[in-house]
Regions:
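Amphipathic alpha-helical polymerization modules
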Residues: 1-90, 162-267
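Polar, low-complexity export/assembly segments characteristic of proteins
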Residues: 2, 74, 78-188
Length: 267
């Protein structure tokens, strides 16, 4: 009985540790996805303002600033130096461009990403894994596509936003056609941020319950060692409600995954 109880206690502690790691990553991602969503909203506003004011002279500068910040977010690392949004390629920066001219020169926006395809998962219970990883290409493709479109048009014969005091007909038509994509990008990133927040809250609840589970098992082991098995089992049975609640929350985590909530990139 003692050996089985010690095994169960060690397993519960390990799952609690894994879940807390997942909570920490989801919390960090929440901050960064919120910032990325804000950048998408900035780009949408920059296009809208250019149309409303009949002046896009500052749009290239704003677009480059947004690219700088988005790249910094998507190439961020954890405490161990691993790229958060790189998937299994966590030792390689997932975003490979740093300037609008580089972005405009790509055949496809997908060439701007070098992340892997496997999203990070964490085992939080027996047979229960939760996907918490987010890929740079999943949340960054649409934003970089809009920036690529702007950079490509600006470099073309009818572009040159910075050199125009008022919008030409071609510039107006381009920005008008680009605005819906910018709106969709901002909406999708808001959805991704909310989805990550849901996963974070679910994991946080589970971590609390797993702490209860770990404490119960540790107490059970201590009781066996210091009292007798019969008394220990009686004490454990008295805590069945808390034990069942902790196990139920852990089991429900198998239904939680960012994959179920993130909109697919359209680029």
């Amino acid at each position: 009985v003692l050996e089985a109880a010690q095994t169960a206690s060690a397993r519960a502690t390990a799952y609690q540790s894994n879940t807390q790691m997942a909570v920490n990553q989801a919390d960090l991602q929440d901050t960064q996805l919120t910032a990325l969503s804000g950048l998408a909203s900035q780009l949408q506003k920059a296009i809208s303002d250019a149309l409303a004011n009949n002046d896009a002279s500052t749009l290239p500068t704003q677009a480059q600033s947004i690219l700088d910040q988005a790249t910094q977010i998507l190439n961020s690392t954890d405490a161990n130096g691993n790229y958060l949004y790189g998937g299994e390629k966590d030792n390689t920066p997932p975003v490979t461009v740093s300037t609008l001219s580089q972005l405009a020169g790509l055949t496809s926006v997908s060439d701007a990403f070098d992340n892997g395809t496997e999203k990070k998962s964490v085992q939080v219970g027996s047979g229960q894994s939760v996907q918490i990883g987010v890929l740079a290409s999943d949340v960054g493709t649409n934003l970089l596509q809009t920036l690529k479109d702007i950079a490509g048009f600006d470099a073309g014969p009818t572009g040159n936003f910075a050199g125009s005091t008022t919008l030409t007909s071609a510039q107006n038509d381009f920005l008008t056609s680009e605005l819906p994509q910018a709106v969709t990008t901002a909406t999708n990133l808001n959805t991704a941020t909310a989805a990550n927040g849901y996963v974070y809250n679910s994991l946080q609840d589970a971590a609390t319950n797993q702490g209860t589970l770990s404490t119960l098992y540790s107490g059970f082991v201590s009781s066996i060692q210091n009292v007798d098995p019969a008394t220990a089992i009686t004490q454990l049975n008295a805590n069945q409600t808390a034990l069942q609640a902790a196990l139920q929350v852990t089991a429900q985590l198998g239904q939680v995954s960012l994959l179920n909530y993130l909109p697919a990139p359209t680029g």
